[in-house]
Amino acid sequence: MKKLTLLLVIILAGLMAFAQDVKTYQYVQRDTLELKLDFYTPSQVTDSTICVVYIFGGGFIMGNRDGEFEKAYFKQLVDEGFQVAAIDYRLGLKGVKNLSITNSQPLEDAIYMATEDAISAIAFLLEHSKELKVNKDYIVMVGSSAGAITSLQTDYALCNGFLNSNILPADFRLAGVVSYAGAIYSREGKVKYRNHEPAPTMFYHGTADKLVPYKQIKFFKIGFFGADALVKRFEKFGYPYYARRFEGYGHSVAAGGPVTVDDLVWFCRHYVLKKEHLQVDGFYRNLDPRTMPAFDMYTPGDLYK
């Protein structure tokens, strides 16, 4: 019993020490809404420290930047030497019902709002880079589900001059994007990166995802393009990527961050720091979908009703 008590004290002390390393900032105000970010710092920061901008998931209807799941993940990242900026963003699908390909305007609006907020958060980090010791050349976006959509969409906007991307320096480039079950929304048909190539991107996606398409959904030129469709574009144009496809899995892959930290470290070492131009693709078929939680097979109808 004494050993267990001591262990709990050690764990609690560790979490308290971790909490003391976070500072909260308001990065932008939208009307009366104050959007904030929590900034976590490792014990040592160097010129090669990577800053992860994390975008939480929740279908653009729920979620927050400082949930227990998120904070545990951030501790893993900080322990690996990453800075973490966990941001708020506007949840544009709250109250929306009957979302579909023929009723996609609410989704478009929500994605664009979240993307504008993410770009504003990056602008804040750049403006305060000296104070926060952020290297502007090593900013990597990581997102889950709606956050993954936002992360991919942010890089898409920066590469094409969309939305409020002009608030960032013209030479700014994301160092990487990591998407856990994300997609890109386009009104122009297939995804195109016109002004410069996209950041090296790590894709995680379940092949049976019914909430965010693994392949694509198209209605004339309006489309929602998941990992499979995006990898084909990256492959065609020679863009660097790292894809992990989970055969038979649905949307639960969105929660894969904490169990893939080693992958993230490898990706950042090779794609971000060493700038290796790699294209890595892998299927994972020896997995049992029956072990997945109920939300693994969620559809839009389960969230927007």
Language-model regions, residue ranges each:
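Primarily recognizes the serine-hydrolase "nucleophile elbow" in alpha/beta-hydrolase
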Residues: 123-197
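Alpha/beta-hydrolase active-site loop
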Residues: 105-131, 226
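Short beta-strand element of the alpha/beta-hydrolase
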Residues: 48-59
